[in-house]
From Swiss-Prot:
Belongs to the class I-like SAM-binding methyltransferase superfamily. RNA M5U methyltransferase family. TrmA subfamily. PROSITE patterns: SAM_MT_RNA_M5U, TRMA_1, TRMA_2. It catalyses: uridine(54) in tRNA + S-adenosyl-L-methionine = 5-methyluridine(54) in tRNA + S-adenosyl-L-homocysteine + H(+); uridine(341) in tmRNA + S-adenosyl-L-methionine = 5-methyluridine(341) in tmRNA + S-adenosyl-L-homocysteine + H(+). GO terms for molecular function: rRNA binding; tRNA (uracil(54)-C5)-methyltransferase activity, S-adenosyl methionine-dependent; tRNA binding. HAMAP family: RNA_methyltr_TrmA. The active site is at residues 324, 358. It comes from Shigella flexneri serotype 5b (strain 8401). The gene is trmA. Its EC number is 2.1.1.-, 2.1.1.35. This is tRNA/tmRNA (uracil-C(5))-methyltransferase.
Length: 366
């Protein structure tokens, strides 16, 4: 695979290899055959970041080879959305011969949606001034004249200039209902939107008929908690990053959801609060004891669950675990399988043609 060529003819083979690998890893805990969810074979990534290389009068996107660290010129990127590919060409054309926008530009980040909106961030090793803003506004207007629905942001050390806004609103069809998700530049969002829809629909399927309330740790912009709200009486979700919490609050309102509460708190802190180890001002007005948590949802970072959170989640009858790293999932399952058994197992091909796998498990108390 090269940045400008995807081996689409190998898609089925690489997916089959992942299925075998996941089954092998899960064998100590379950003999289930994974439910498999396929990605589009190209144009599946909704975000991409590129370094910018200055080569005489020329200017182009590059990435670095992970093994050799050599730079690779990238003029098109079929893994990314068609909108990103259009913008890559348009941005280079707009910046190449503009001294103000070009000078000390070292990176461009792209974030797009299925609803065809984009935020493009230009990163600089220089101070950004009014002249930069004027030139950036002219570029933005020129891009919009090409029917590109784009917002531009300039970034430098301790500086962020958003010409209009630093977010876009994604609209996803999820099990017959349109969900609106505000996505903020430089905050985590699911990279593969088509796969995200399938993950949300799978999570809805495995939790249908649920009783009681849902607790979610690491909720981000509310991606899962808002979609799952229809299956539960109430949802309480935690998130530590301020921009993600703000986006989640917006998304609650935008989707007319009235049974979800988001609190800004680390998973480890929430564990302490639930165990009565310490009190938090942030929980004032929230009666934790009034919740009947029957299901806990976790979508942890690549490092998986820490040992304290492992112990905490074992207290719940059902654990829904989405993992971006099956190795740490299996490490967590060494503990969780003492009290819970695997009821459902899914493989989501979030990153085709790479070693990475995303998977989901539903665990129920033995």
């Amino acid at each position: 695979m090269t940045p400008e060529h995807l081996p689409t003819e190998q898609y089925e083979a690489q997916l089959a290899e992942k299925v075998v690998r996941l089954q092998s890893m899960m064998a100590p805990f379950s003999d289930l055959v994974p439910e498999v969810f396929r990605s589009p074979v190209s144009h599946y990534r909704m975000r991409a970041e590129f370094r910018i290389w200055h080569d005489g009068d020329d200017l182009y996107h590059i990435i670095f080879d992970q093994q050799t660290k050599s730079r690779i010129r990238v003029d098109s990127f079929p893994a990314a959305s068609e909108l990103i590919n259009q913008l890559m060409t348009a941005m280079i054309a707009g910046v190449r011969n503009n001294p103000v926008l070009r000078h000390k530009l070292f990176q461009i980040d792209y974030l797009t949606t299925l609803s065809n909106q984009a935020v493009v961030s230009l990163l600089y090793h220089k101070k950004l001034d009014d002249e930069w803003r004027q030139e950036a506004e002219a570029l933005r207007d020129a891009l919009r004249a090409q029917n590109l629905n784009v917002h531009l942001i300039g970034r430098a050390t301790k500086t962020k200039i958003a010409l209009d806004q630093d977010y876009i609103d994604e609209r996803l069809p999820v099990a017959g209902k349109e969900m609106i998700y505000r996505q903020v530049e430089n905050s985590f969002t699911q990279p593969n939107a088509a796969m995200n829809i399938q993950m949300l629909e799978w999570a809805l399927d495995v939790t249908k008929g649920s009783k009681g309330d849902l607790l979610e740790l690491y909720c981000g912009n509310g991606n899962f908690s808002l979609a799952l709200a229809r299956n539960f009486d109430r949802v309480l979700a935690t998130e530590i990053a301020k921009p993600s919490v703000a986006a989640a609050q917006y998304n609650i309102t935008a989707n007319h959801i009235d049974n979800v509460q988001i609190i800004r708190m680390a998973a480890e802190e929430f564990t302490q609060a639930m165990n009565g180890v310490r009190e938090f001002n942030r929980l004032q007005g929230i009666d934790l004891k009034s919740y009947q948590f029957e299901t806990i949802f976790v979508d942890p970072p690549r490092s998986g669950l820490d040992s304290e959170t492992e112990k905490m989640v074992q207290a719940y009858p059902r654990i829904l675990y989405i993992s971006c790293n099956p190795e740490t999932l299996c490490k967590n399952l060494e503990t969780l399988s003492q009290t819970h058994k695997v009821e459902r197992l899914a493989l989501f091909d979030q990153f085709p043609y790479t070693h990475h796998m995303e998977c989901g498990v539903l665990l129920t108390a033995k």
